[in-house]
Regions:
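Conserved beta-strand in the GNAT
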Residues: 37, 43-52, 69, 74
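A conserved beta-strand-loop-helix scaffold within acyl/acetyltransferase catalytic domains
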Residues: 48-58, 63
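Conserved acetyl-CoA binding element of GNAT-fold acetyltransferases
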Residues: 61-77, 129
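Conserved acetyl-CoA pyrophosphate-binding loop and the N-cap/start of the following alpha-helix
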Residues: 79-91
Length: 141
């Protein structure tokens, strides 16, 4: 997935994949992360996940319920444009609604933006400051 998006290559991919496997395994065990896969004959062709974040209560979320961050949305190139990402996101949103999760957010590529906008996602005014300008390798925090 990281290579397909052009984010990492070579040794960086291996380091990030290893750290991701460890982190996701722990988050799956704790219930903090839930993932969905689409398979054909036992081989994954698409997937997505949701990571629950606990924030302090706010005006929009007065009881401080966890919010959902959707990530790891990926469809194998041979199976794109078949609506798999849309169905995965619809499944995740239904899962969130069943749990009374008040908000779902995500980051998207330009390719994915139309999918999310059709499902009702809107841009927000989030700001970000990168505190390091280097790609970390090895053990990631």
């Amino acid at each position: 997935m990281f290579q397909a998006m052009g984010e990492l290559d070579g040794a960086d991919v291996k380091a990030v994949e290893s750290a991701t496997r460890e982190r996701v395994a722990a988050q799956l065990a704790s219930g903090e992360y839930t993932g969905w896969l689409v398979e054909i004959d036992g081989a994954p062709i698409a997937g997505a996940g949701v990571l629950l974040h606990q924030y302090h209560p706010t005006r929009q979320n007065p009881d401080g319920r966890p919010t959902a961050y959707i990530l790891n949305v990926y469809t194998d190139p041979l199976h794109r444009r078949a609506g798999l990402a849309t169905r995965l996101i619809e499944t995740i949103l239904a899962w969130c609604r069943e749990r009374d999760i008040p908000r779902a957010s995500l980051h998207t590529s330009e390719w994915g933006r139309p999918v999310y906008e059709r499902l009702g996602f809107v841009p927000t005014h989030e700001l970000r400051l990168e505190l390091t300008n280097r790609v970390r390798t090895g053990s990631l925090p």
